[in-house]
A protein has these predicted regions:
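Bacterial Sec-dependent N-terminal signal peptides
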Residues: 1-28
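Charge-rich (acidic/polar
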Residues: 23-134
Length: 134
């Protein structure tokens, strides 16, 4: 299970990158949207299974991911259209939105759920973001 928790965030990021690279052509906006919504659905299901979320919590997690991941995607697209090549800027955008998601999760989850989420990978992700800030 720990292996899954380690691999899942990396796989989720690659979920958006690898299919486009494998096709050697840009994905259509519809394909990108479908892929993002599939990822959001899987992540909501994963968190529901791990944390035993109530229905209203599932709704807020889904809404948070939908809003924040779309906002992150839009910000990354604006960097790409400006032809920014500095990967640190892209990671900064990603870290900013992942931090925002964690802040929102902390408000949605009860204390026991937050501790379980934090131990299942949230804390490690935060440490990695903190290292990149230095």
């Amino acid at each position: 299970m720990k292996f899954f928790r380690l691999i899942f965030p990396c796989a989720a990021i690659l979920l958006f990158v690898l299919p486009a690279a494998a096709q050697n052509q840009p994905q259509s906006p519809e394909q990108q949207e479908k892929q993002m919504m599939e990822y959001i659905d899987k992540e909501v299901k994963r968190l529901t299974d791990i944390l035993d979320l109530e229905y209203w919590q599932e709704f807020y997690v889904d809404s948070t991911l939908t809003h924040d991941l779309h906002a992150m995607s839009d910000e990354i697209k604006s960097l790409q259209s400006a032809k920014v090549e500095n990967s640190d800027l892209y990671m900064g955008v990603r870290d900013k939105w992942m931090e925002q998601i964690d802040v929102t999760y902390k408000r949605i989850f009860n204390e026991a759920q937050w501790k379980k989420y934090w131990k299942s990978g949230g804390q490690r992700a935060q440490r990695e973001r903190d290292k990149r800030k230095k």
